Amino acid sequence: METKGYHSLPEGLDMERRWGQVSQAVEHSSLGSTERTDENNYMEIVNVSCVSGAIPNNSTQGSSKEKHELLPCLQQDNNRPGILTSDIKTELESKELSATVAESMGLYMDSVRDADYYEQQNQQRSMSPAKIYQNVEQLVKFYKENGHRPSTLSCVNRPLRSFMSDSVSSVNGGVMRAIVKSPIMCHEKSPSVCSPLNMTSSVCSPAGINSVSSTTASFGSFPVHSPITQGTPLTCSPNVENRGSRSHSPAHASNVGSPLSSPLSSMKSSISSPPSHCSVKSPVSSPNNVTPRSSVSSPANINNSRCSVSSPSNTNNRSTLSSPAASTVGSICSPVNNAFSYTASGTSAGSSTSRDVVPSPDTQEKGAQEVPFPKTEEVESAISNGVTGQLNIVQYIKPEPDGAFSSSCLGGNSKINSDSPFSVPIKQESTKHSCSGTSFKGNPTVNPFPFMDGSYFSFMDDKDYYSLSGILGPPVPGFDGTCEGSGFPVGIKQEPDDGSYYPEASIPSSAIVGVNSGGQSFHYRIGAQGTISLSRSARDQSFQHLSSFPPVNTLVESWKSHGDLSSRRSDGYPVLEYIPENVSSSTLRSVSTGSSRPSKICLVCGDEASGCHYGVVTCGSCKVFFKRAVEGQHNYLCAGRNDCIIDKIRRKNCPACRLQKCLQAGMNLGARRSKKLGKLKGIHEEQPQQQPPPPPPPPQSPEEGTTYIAPAKEPSVNTALVPQLSAISRALTPSPAMVLENIEPEVVYAGYDNSKPDTAENLLSTLNRLAGKQMIQVVKWAKVLPGFKNLPLEDQITLIQYSWMCLSSFALSWRSYKHTNSQFLYFAPDLVFNEEKMHQSAMYELCQGMHQISLQFIRLQLTFEEYTIMKVLLLLSTVPKDGLKSQAAFEEMRTNYIKELRKMVTKCPNNSGQSWQRFYQLTKLLDSMHDLVNDLLEFCFYTFRESQALKVEFPAMLVEIISDQLPKVESGNAKPLYFHRK
């Protein structure tokens, strides 16, 4: 066997001649500094290949015999468990194999010497090969002592890591470590130390590279590969922990074609990692999980505390280097996606040499499967003559966009090793599972934060505009007589702001003071110094529509309930309260003294408003005009089509359209204060009544002329706090009358055309269209009526069909009473009947009957609260003779509203001592409505039958109601409910 001995050659010989004889070259890179610490040390890879089928039968030289005697541990023990008797070779073959190993060791020492020669150009310091050889000799002795033991490497009393730390030698002030890491592909029952004779596969010679299922053996701890028949071997690694860069041979080597088919195809590549063509510093990770603290576990599942040898079945540990089969931790699958701060290719003492590595032409011609390698960009400062400088160039590794990306998987929990002097800025995307051997598929983005649509508190949503059952919809729980609940019909879950979206210490001052465009701003009242707005995070933008609700108390209390929010937002300031920005402009204007908000604008003409007049923010001119127009009972007519423009300049051109716009804005002579002001007034009025009278002052002493003042007692919880809280709770709890006031339908316009003649058919058609619009409002009013939704849907429809005419005529009498002082019939702001129009409508007697009801309102001085409760009782005043489906719920609801009317009459200050008499008068008025409604229904049914002959139009809503009501009423199925007997 012919082996190549080690010769002590001078440092200045031509090195290029030697690189042609070595299949793989070892490249070293240096930081250029004379002193280096352990964190910046290089890592030497002892990876000498050997295959049993490539041992030539030649005689060895003297120097190779020397090395052969230093490697007695390479001889295989025949008594070792897991080795078959058929695989036992003769001692001669073992000696030949040892000689081949010695030859490989000689090649390795030549490469080390060459690397030292390049480093000596800058640092003038060298290390004798004898020291390196001495360290290798110590390692061989160590393996000799432990090589013939039946146990695995993990059972060694002294770990290899400690031995390496003792036997490590310094190169140029640094530390050189021999590290080889790769998953083991041996049999599961076989030990980790085996000969190439025990392997199940073989590597072909360079002439036949078609068989690429090569496996290599590890003698002791040294994986040996033949440089002549270099395939893609899998090496068994000693469990040595490295702190620098790592070198891993790819795992599925049996399926991968070797790019190193011929020794001439390697251009300054490392011996240790054949498929990678990288230097000692370049990592070739296997497609399994490589973690920063990786170790190798044994095939026998014997784990050490710090170092172990692992089979593919024992790879679920976070700190193990395992086979590509099983791994659940984030992995780094190829040099493309390396997150351990390793360079992509080997550099020589500071240069950034980048080159595209391609497989051998022989491999491509043989049809072997190619290994996907990272494609690196060329750097202009490539090594040309061996003279290098300091390493200061960062290589950017770009993965291939095609299927080659399947071999690279981005590590989920890999961290940048700060100890490495090289920084590879590679963009990483976290993945949960390893994508080894499969094509990469991006995970679809999931919105963590999903948008939930809220329900608006509005009874103007119509499913079917002309369907009674469609407007009512399915029943929901409602009022049971006590009107419990808040302004929100649905429960809105408020999540606490945990502050995880932004650090408190990193908020700039511009994001604290002022409104930030990134989200909704909340105003904080700080004494009388103005407001400070703090931007909300993006997670609260999905609930911005909550601020459109008129009641803010519930929402504010839910926000205030979180202690972390109040403590974090205050920042030492006395935060009294905070209000959403777009809730009420008047409220914020009263809060902020230094705000530059626009002045109030008249809702009628657009001029500058002087205040709230008759319930609407208007100017003084529109206020006076409305008062004179209503009290003077002027019957204005528009010269156009009731669509004149009313602004500051043209507001006096058409008084009819101006009055129409005033009514449309909501102006009313009997308008009361807003609900909020009423609450505050109720609190202030109840507090003096609940306070005990002050004690009489003590008599004044005439001698001294001084007044003795009794010491003021501190208010206790029982005497002062509880009454105030009870008063506030009573004021904030809406009463049934308050709820009925808020849900009262708005004013509806008839759309009367003044250009047409006032004939009976035109007036009746206009009244029918107006009644259809008003019925839609009535149905939606009943839908939100407290307690009405508790009834079955069939009962709701029946009650509305029986009482629609009664409700319309009663509301007409109220509007005539409030707007015209019961002198005219106020059907709509644009349709008011005087005596002349009553005669023209062909229903003069019926109009007089409705006018009499309006006059009764004047006599009784009916209040709005009484009117709303009486209106509900009229809704519940006519039922079928057979009864309703839920008669008990109907009786309970009607009884509750009768009690509410009794309470309202008792609270009236003008009826002290005469409450029962007034209650009797109001109930008699309700009974009188039945006689009037019977006459109105008879006239309506007649015009409905003769609508084509009379040319009277009926809207779709009235057609539906009358068609269902007409046969029931004419058959006598309707039963009116009276309070008093006739």
Swiss-Prot record:
Compositionally biased intervals (Low complexity): 258-299, 345-354
Ranges for domain NR LBD: 724-962
Location within or outside the cell: Cytoplasm; Nucleus
GO molecular function, one term: DNA-binding transcription factor activity
Family, per entry: Belongs to the nuclear hormone receptor family. NR3 subfamily.
PANTHER family: KNIRPS-RELATED PROTEIN-RELATED (PTHR48092)
Protein name, entry field: Mineralocorticoid receptor
Gene for this chain: NR3C2
